[in-house]
Amino acid sequence: MGQKIHPTGFRLAVSRNWASRWYASNTKFAGMLKEDIEVRDFLKKKLKNASVGRVVIERPARNARITIYSSRPGVVIGKKGEDIELLKAELQRRMGVPVHVNIEEIRKPETDAQLIADSITQQLERRIMFRRAMKRAMQNAMRLGAQGIKIMSAGRLNGIEIARTEWYREGRVPLHTLRADIDYGFSEAETTYGIIGVKVWVYKGDHLGRNDAPVVEEPQDDRRRRPGRPEGRRREGEGRPGGNRRGGAGAGRRAAPGADAKSGE
């Protein structure tokens, strides 16, 4: 039975980058990884209404730099920057090192896979039909430049007794092409019937490598020209129609005996 590989992990070091960018010794690695998971869970709950797509954590020497990608940066910053200062103080208390927080805006939230998944789960929690939510998200993504999108929902859809899986796809979604820019997102909706999982794949085109850019070549004239002969040298028969061609009008013919005499008469 075929299973789907995680699109981001499949493309790491090819066209994707890690969400946690730091190095640690074997004794410290587990603790720092657990710290990153706790920070992401905290930010997900704290900034639930800020439409956060992803969080990148970097650890330079004895510092931490957290970049939050959000489609509503004003909600994260707050009035006169009060909310972000409180957020920075809480992160410093949790991580134990000075923390620098950067906010990056997501220009097109309709084509961000994580934001699409979060939007669908919020609609499911408000008892909106899952088919309507999925098709509306697909239409918005294709309208704003996505080349393909696939959405899959699994669980007790519409409150049925037996859980099932339904998915819809529009456009092209190449999952095993490494140069394909596939954005992947996952979210869970906590409904009264149970948890419904939503997965989203968005295809945004191909990544062109440094040497893969198409080169536009000028059209060349492939017709071979015969080099010119010096003046004053002509082959016999040149200048008459068909005289310089094999099998022409005057080639291969022999004058009939007595033809000149008949023409002179």
Curated annotation (Swiss-Prot):
Q: How does it assemble?
A: Part of the 30S ribosomal subunit. Forms a tight complex with proteins S10 and S14.
Point to the regions of Gly residues compositional bias: 240-251
Concerning InterPro entries, the annotation shows:
KH_dom, KH_dom-like_a/b, KH_dom_type_2, KH_sf_prok-type, Ribosomal_S3_C_sf, Ribosomal_uS3_bac-typ, Ribosomal_uS3_C, Ribosomal_uS3_CS
> Has keyword RNA-binding?
yes
* Pfam families, per database record: KH_2, Ribosomal_S3_C
Q: What terms describe the molecular function in GO for this protein?
A: mRNA binding; rRNA binding; structural constituent of ribosome
Give residue ranges for domain KH type-2: 39-107
- Name of the protein: Small ribosomal subunit protein uS3
Q: What does this protein do?
A: Binds the lower part of the 30S subunit head. Binds mRNA in the 70S ribosome, positioning it for translation.
Region annotation Disordered: where it falls in the sequence: 211-265
Signal peptide positions are none
| Family annotation (Gene3D superfamilies) | 3.30.300.20, Ribosomal protein S3, C-terminal domain
